[in-house]
Amino acid sequence: MENGEVEMNECMENEIMQQDLEMLVDSDLPITALEGKSVLVTGATGLIGSQMVYLLACYNRMRNLQIHIIAMVRNEEKGKKMFSHLIGRGDVELLVGDINRPVVYSDSVDYIIHGASATSSKYFVSNPVETIYTALDGTSNILKFATEKKINGMVYLSSLEVYGTPEKDADLITENDYGYIEPLSVRSSYSEGKRMVECLCASYAHEYSVPVKIARLSQTFGPGVAYEDGRVFAEFARCALEQRDIVLHTQGHTVRS
């Protein structure tokens, strides 16, 4: 960096997000294995994917880890808008592509964070076929790519929806407790897709020794959620901001903790 230049923060004007990133960098997370490595993040413009990109870039700035971040995006314009300052800083390389097609990238890749997925409940219902194919074909392409690159590690971002509907008398569930999922409901395109992809990951680990781990995420929200996001928490927030009544389409008996 030349004298007089100001190094931009990862989250630009969002001070809350920036404080969160720097707090994580100052913690004792076991991050040194990524030093000097290349990390591919799919779904990089999404809520979780973008946070991964920002966090790794923050490690580069604060700890000089020299992680090469490959942000895979479908929309090049959106990717440049979100990460242009990090591209200019040399932290991020944009890889424009669709996970539903084979991944084309000539350089080495050491780690993969696979977060590309359909995320809107409305989309699951209106486009169940695409939801399923994005999960299965998309992750299959990423796993094939991981096999070719002989990666050191991969994380697949799954969902608590793989647990289905638990028994009514169950106070707590473990990772080994799986409830019912209605296979004939188009809304199940997401949860059944996630279940099948977890099996696909386990199969690649068994047959091709791909070092893939699975993280089952709960409802995820925070700074960076798009205003038009179709999930229920975003609709509640919009109703509050726009002073509209909240309209429930169920009896409201579902409980999450």
Positions of predicted regions on the chain:
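NAD(P)-dependent short-chain dehydrogenase/reductase
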Residues: 166-176, 189, 199-257
